[in-house]
A protein has these predicted regions:
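PLP-dependent class I/II
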Residues: 1-23, 27, 31-33, 38-53, ...
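A glycine-/small-polar-enriched, mobile loop at the entrance of the PLP active site in fold-type I
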Residues: 56-61, 75-93
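Conserved N-terminal alpha-helix of the aminotransferase class I/II PLP-enzyme fold
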Residues: 83-116
Length: 410
């Protein structure tokens, strides 16, 4: 070896080794969002030229309605692009409470509302300001992927409440009551449900609201899909106005108005909780983008015909995808009562194919069939996959054809 090479090697061996960063204990409590991970994997394959049918992302295939876009454009042209108050301008908070009162019979003031950068931030802020280390939060299974992680990030303990597939995964007041302990601080209800499409009956929801109120337990109502109830008029637990001191409504414009990328959400609740959420928000995102607030006002105060039209299309898409899934050997599927997800049981297919888990099935479907789905493990179950049917009718038919061809190999 030459002297030059020896010197180079010596320098290399004496160079300091980069140590792995020491991350906080808190960040170790959570995982990457499974739905975001699936979206990233699909995007990578698309970039490589793959033609995929994407049942993964829970976002409408519709464009944002014209009048909503026009409101944002007008705001930009008027230079409405500066900071606003953290909780949102008075007009957007007024629009939120008036729309909710009109549609659901609730009773809130603008001071009991905060506008957030997406519904997920409303959930995050609510949990952060209410949950302390060791507090129990009742969470029905299956659950949306982020609930568990956000609770654990706050130091809370998740109390999983199993539901029965034979009963369409519905949550009942009796089941909730059986899960309450002296350490129960909050209950999270998502109706219609992501991922199952289950809808809590109006009677059970009202009983749960009164139960939580009588026990001094906070009830977080995730109403992101509240306008996508298919068999009856939308309803909210916040209509039980005498219990409002223990209710936090978590809302979003993303699904209702096809505004997922706008990041427009809100929370309604008791003034002290909303003030605390605004305080936390003041140290993180601050206000939502000014022009988004103007777009939200247009969405909430303008014609709601677009909401009705999208809901009607989702019903047709639901009927098509459920019938198609039920026709595939090894797959059974409950009938979703709302939202825009099918949550089929694939245990028969796993057994037939020898594929060990829904997660592995998801990988196989992505690479072998070009079909994007989300594994049930992300939602707390071991025999299911989730398909979002908020896609075009053509994509539903193509995706079902690919699924049939994949299953026919076994």
């Amino acid at each position: 070896m030459s002297a030059t090479a020896t010197l180079a090697n010596a320098k290399q061996s004496s160079a300091p080794q980069t140590a792995a960063p020491k991350l906080s204990e808190r960040i170790g409590r959570i995982e990457v969002s499974a739905t975001m991970a699936v979206t990233a994997a699909a995007a990578k394959l698309r970039a490589e030229g793959a033609k995929l049918v994407d049942f993964g992302a829970g976002e409408p295939h519709f464009a944002t309605p014209r009048h909503i876009k026009d409101a944002a454009i007008a705001a930009i042209e008027a230079n409405f692009s500066r900071y606003t108050v953290v909780s949102g301008i008075a007009e957007v908070r007024k629009a939120i409470v008036e729309r909710h009162a009109c549609d659901f019979g609730s009773s809130y003031t603008p001071e009991e509302a905060v506008f957030t950068t997406g519904g997920k931030l409303a959930l995050f802020n609510a949990i952060e300001v209410l949950i302390d280390h060791g507090d129990e939060v009742i969470l029905p299974v299956p659950y949306w992927v982020s609930y568990k992680d956000i609770i654990q990030y706050a130091g809370g303990k998740v109390v999983y409440l199993e539901t029965a597939e034979s009963e369409n995964f519905r949550v009942t007041a009796e089941a909730i009551e059986s899960a309450i302990t002296p350490r129960t601080k909050a209950i999270i209800l998502n109706s219609p449900s992501n991922p199952s499409g289950a809808v809590i009956s109006r009677a059970d929801l009202e009983r749960i609201v009164r139960l939580a109120h009588s026990r001094g337990i906070y009830l977080m109502l995730d109403e992101c899909y509240a306008y996508l109830i298919f068999n009856e008029a939308p309803f909210s637990g916040a209509s039980v106005t005498e219990a409002k001191e223990h209710i936090i409504v978590l809302g979003s414009l993303s699904k209702t108005y096809a505004m997922t990328g706008w990041r427009a959400g809100f929370a309604l609740g008791p003034k002290p909780i909303i003030a605390a959420m605004s305080k936390l928000q003041s140290q993180s995102t601050s206000s939502t983008a000014a022009m988004v607030q103007k777009a939200a006002i247009a969405a909430l105060t303008g014609s709601q015909e677009c909401v009705c039209e999208m809901r009607a299309d989702y019903i047709h898409l639901r009927d098509t995808i459920v019938a198609g899934l039920r026709s595939i050997p090894g797959i059974t599927c409950t009938m979703p009562e709302g939202a825009f997800y099918a949550y089929p049981n694939v245990s028969g297919l796993l057994k037939k194919s020898g594929i060990p888990t829904p997660a592995e099935l998801t990988t196989r479907l992505l690479h072998d069939a070009g079909v994007v789905v989300v594994p049930g493990e992300a939602f707390g179950t071991q025999e299911h996959i989730r398909l979002s049917y908020a896609v075009s009718h053509k994509d539903v038919e193509e995706g079902l054809a690919r699924l049939r061809a994949f299953v026919a190999k076994f």
